[in-house]
Amino acid sequence: MQKILHINPDKCTGCLQCEMACSFENYGTFATAKSRIKVFDFHETGKKVPYTCTQCDEAWCMHACPVEAIKHDKVTGAMVVNETTCVGCKVCTIACPFGTINYVQETGKVQKCDLCGGDPACASACPTGAITFVDANWTGLDKMKQWADKLGNQPSAA
């Protein structure tokens, strides 16, 4: 069964454990600059919001890549960059409407979240549960039904 990263910004404290875990998992070093997940800080409101590749169905990055270096991993559901095939042209970074593919200066290639092969380090490291790895079929409709069941039948406001 496919799983996805679910991010609940209301639970994020901005501790950056997700960024540290990601960089260590992928590069063996604790460096937020090398993380494939980022925590955006909305200074005006004090809100912290983790964001990374959503592994979207449209996969604009994959379709834009002129050398087909991005492939869909059928096991994890992730769009994965083949670093051997990638030529570093950055077309995928332009195609991604979410800005979650990054060019890595040291390698001359791009990087993006690959769900750590099915066991995302960011979700495991998150101390507040702001990042979880959940069943992909648990959709918004399922959440609404769950809330409705919790609330029971309420009288209408007629």
Task: Identify the function of each model-found stretch.
Residues 1-7:
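N-terminal beta-strand motif that seeds the catalytic metal site of vicinal oxygen chelate
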Residues 2, 31-67, 83-158:
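Flanking helices and flexible, charged tails adjoining ferredoxin-like Fe-S electron-transfer domains
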Residues 10-30, 35-42:
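A positional/architectural concept
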